[in-house]
Amino acid sequence: VMNHYNNVLKVYKKTGTFWEYYAPEDAAPGFMARKDFVGWTGLPPIADLIEYIFGIRADIQDSHVTLDVQLLDAYGIDRYPLGADGNISFKVAKRSSVNEKPKVTINTNIPFKLTLIWGDGESVEKEVAVGNNAI
């Protein structure tokens, strides 16, 4: 996913626009692809970034969020929606190794269950309360 995300970004920086689809072997627009066309290209900057690069996946039915931290850099997201009324902000601090437990700050207006995953399968589950939470 990171490779695809970076290639879409390279093409955007080169051409100044998004394309209908991209070349499979190069950071270039696909053959006969239409420019200024979001279509499937809308997935990498939104869904892929949130779900696969930031590692945030939600199960609305169970009010459960999985945060699978793979990055070493600090990152975050504000107002991540959970259900009709939920707004959650996640801030993950910079780490020095993948096996270092992530430090996560969460601000939420609804309670939910969190599974935090990192390293070689390490994980912790926590009930997150309304307000500011440090994990």
Predicted segments with their positions:
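Non-catalytic C-terminal accessory modules of carbohydrate-active enzymes
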Residues: 1-135
